[in-house]
UniProtKB/Swiss-Prot annotation:
The gene is rplK. It comes from Verminephrobacter eiseniae (strain EF01-2). Part of the ribosomal stalk of the 50S ribosomal subunit. Interacts with L10 and the large rRNA to form the base of the stalk. L10 forms an elongated spine to which L12 dimers bind in a sequential fashion forming a multimeric L10(L12)X complex. The keyword RNA-binding applies. SMART domains: RL11. GO terms for cellular component: cytosolic large ribosomal subunit. This is Large ribosomal subunit protein uL11. The keyword Metal-binding does not apply. Belongs to the universal ribosomal protein uL11 family.
Length: 143
């Protein structure tokens, strides 16, 4: 018989830096899950990833206090900022432009994000990412 699911917890956790402090501790503690077990497993699975890169994680909590988790690809905005070496996006995206990104860079990001994106092909994913870049105040070239 399958385990009974009691809930899902969605968090963004820096790669290799999971610890029991907020937001992880309170979120897992509410469901009665073993916080240190999650932290150790998450840090072990994210060893090969750039430390500190925020990774979305979906934790499935079961009735017997066990859990499983799925680590997704980093957010598109984080990958865009990393590609053009930005600290943060523009406060007013329409009037203040903070950088430029090329179609080739967007294609590279799209290939990374493809498994988590709701796009039929790489071209559709590139257009989606271009919209995200524009909303951050980044000029998209070659699109």
């Amino acid at each position: 018989m399958a385990k009974k699911i009691v809930g899902f917890i969605k968090l963004q956790v820096p790669a290799g830096k999971a610890n029991p402090s907020p937001p992880i501790g309170p979120a897992l503690g509410q469901r009665g899950l073993n916080i240190m077990e999650f932290c150790k497993a998450f840090n072990a699975q994210t060893q090969g990833v750039e430390p500190g890169l925020p990774l979305p994680v979906v934790i499935t909590a079961f009735a017997d206090k066990s859990f499983t988790f799925i680590i997704k690809t980093p957010p598109a905005t984080t990958l865009i900022k990393k590609a053009i070496k930005l600290e943060k996006g523009s406060a007013s995206a329409l009037s203040t432009k903070v950088g430029k990104i090329t179609r080739a860079q967007l294609e590279e990001i799209a290939k990374t994000k493809m498994k988590d994106m709701n796009a039929a092909n790489v071209d559709a994913a590139v257009r989606t990412l271009a919209g995200s870049a524009r909303s951050m105040g980044v000029t998209v070239e070659g699109l």
